[in-house]
């Protein structure tokens, strides 16, 4: 792969890239060859992207060579904690307080064109997206059957903090957080122990 460049794009540029991002989404997911399924999958992604772009603080980083090879995007979690709606049990205090103060940034999607170096590109994308925000935590939700993504996030020091039940899409997601900064990491020593007991693998 040629040298990969990372670049931040604003919401208007992200909207203009919608078609390319949808192609990237379909290419980066193992989908049946049936055209109807691919079209529905593409449309579902575009609808989610449109919804995310409208959220306050939306941010996106793209990876390019001579063409688009990856992207990561998300938004700050609102202080009302709505993003955690459906969390199974009590939200850990170490997460609840930063959420209330606006210190959590949610990564809603990381897409990378399949390639032997795709894990490194994905890691760089998430690091760049989070480094641009003064957040205490990164947060994301993952389908529990998406074992490659769960394994990759865990190798990047994301912690599994529980389950979130949502009415749409997969019934249940694994909720993961990434402590950012030494003080945050130290504050989460107990959470790390909890993560090791909750992790399904």
Which residues fall in each region the model found?
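Conserved active-site tyrosine of GNAT-family acetyltransferases
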Residues: 25, 152-154, 158
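Short amphipathic alpha-helix that is part of the acyltransferase structural core
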Residues: 1-47, 55, 60-69, 73, ...
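Conserved catalytic-core motifs of GNAT/GCN5-like acyltransferases
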Residues: 141, 157-174
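Conserved acyl-donor/pantetheine-binding loop and adjacent beta-alpha core of acyl/acetyltransferases
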Residues: 73-111, 117
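Conserved acetyl-CoA-binding loop-helix of GNAT-fold acetyltransferases
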Residues: 107-131, 155
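Conserved GNAT acetyl-CoA-binding A-motif
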Residues: 131-144
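Short hydrophobic/aromatic beta-strand element in the GNAT-like acyltransferase core
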Residues: 57-62, 71, 104, 109, ...
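A short helix-loop-beta-strand connector motif used in the catalytic cores of GNAT acetyltransferases and
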Residues: 48-62, 77-84, 106
């Amino acid at each position: 792969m040629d040298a990969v460049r990372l670049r931040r794009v604003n919401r208007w540029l992200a909207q203009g890239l919608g078609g390319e991002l949808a192609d990237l989404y379909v290419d980066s997911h193992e989908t049946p060859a049936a055209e109807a399924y691919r079209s529905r999958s593409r449309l579902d992604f575009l609808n989610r992207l449109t919804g995310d772009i409208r959220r306050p603080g939306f941010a996106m980083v793209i990876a390019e060579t001579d063409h688009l090879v990856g992207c990561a995007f998300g938004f700050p979690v609102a202080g009302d904690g709505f993003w955690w709606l459906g969390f199974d049990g009590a939200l850990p205090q170490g997460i609840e307080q930063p959420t209330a103060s606006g210190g959590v940034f949610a990564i809603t999607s990381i897409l990378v064109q399949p390639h032997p170096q795709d894990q490194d590109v994905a890691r760089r994308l998430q690091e760049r997206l989070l480094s641009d925000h003064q957040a205490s935590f990164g947060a994301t939700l993952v389908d529990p059957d998406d074992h490659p993504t769960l394994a990759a996030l865990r190798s990047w020091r994301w912690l599994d903090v529980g389950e979130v039940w949502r009415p749409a899409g997969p019934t249940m997601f694994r909720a993961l957080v990434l402590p950012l900064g030494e003080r945050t990491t130290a504050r989460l020593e107990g959470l790390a122990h909890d993560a090791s007991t909750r992790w399904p693998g």
